[in-house]
């Protein structure tokens, strides 16, 4: 999708210029708007989103990338990156207020719109049920999945078998908020939760469909690799005027 002259209303749900306490209140308000049912149909393009940064960088640069893959072929058809200095502090549970503006700016530069987005991060498995995958899903009005490398809240409900495709629920405060998913035999699992416009079962199915023998599903694996390249090479830009960065 090309960058519009004026931001789409779906990309202007709230200001990003917030204090941490204000950000928490926004999360509480938005969490009730997420839809955790359904299964995307007619998917032809799946995007992976990842962010990298170097904590030793004095300007706190965030390097956000989106990589779009064909489906079911899983070949890269588009990718974009935005590197920008951000002011919001690094606070677990509030990372979307640091990372979403450059992510949305990168997505706004795509020539091919994805039908489904897999985010390196959490969705419903979040202290206020609004991880970055859920937050992005609401802004983009697209089905989104959180696929994280570590647990933010909760614990696995029992042992997870070593075989690829093994699953166990992720429980927090008596509720199933996600699943631990073994995507490769005898390798650490990923932690999957719905972001927006699909259910947990569908989120897990899509992650497994997008795997190619690595721990990470191919969309976020490609995004992870690209974000590291960008981190080593890119210079910061201003987010002003870029789609989705308001």
Swiss-Prot record:
Keywords: Cytoplasm, DNA damage, DNA repair, Endonuclease, Hydrolase, Magnesium, Metal-binding, Nuclease. Pfam families: Endonuclease_5 (PF04493). It comes from the Bacteria. Gene3D superfamilies: archaeoglobus fulgidus dsm 4304 superfamily. The keyword Metal-binding applies. InterPro entries: Endonuclease-V. GO terms for biological process: DNA repair. The record marks 90 as: Interaction with target DNA. One of its GO terms (cellular component) is cytoplasm. It is an enzyme of class 3 (hydrolase). Its EC number is 3.1.21.7. It catalyses: Endonucleolytic cleavage at apurinic or apyrimidinic sites to products with a 5'-phosphate. One of its GO terms (molecular function) is single-stranded RNA binding. Its main location: cytoplasm. Its cofactor is Mg(2+). Mg(2+) binds at residues 50, 120. It is found in: Cytoplasm. DNA repair enzyme involved in the repair of deaminated bases. Selectively cleaves double-stranded DNA at the second phosphodiester bond 3' to a deoxyinosine leaving behind the intact lesion on the nicked DNA. Belongs to the endonuclease V family. This is Endonuclease V. The gene is nfi.
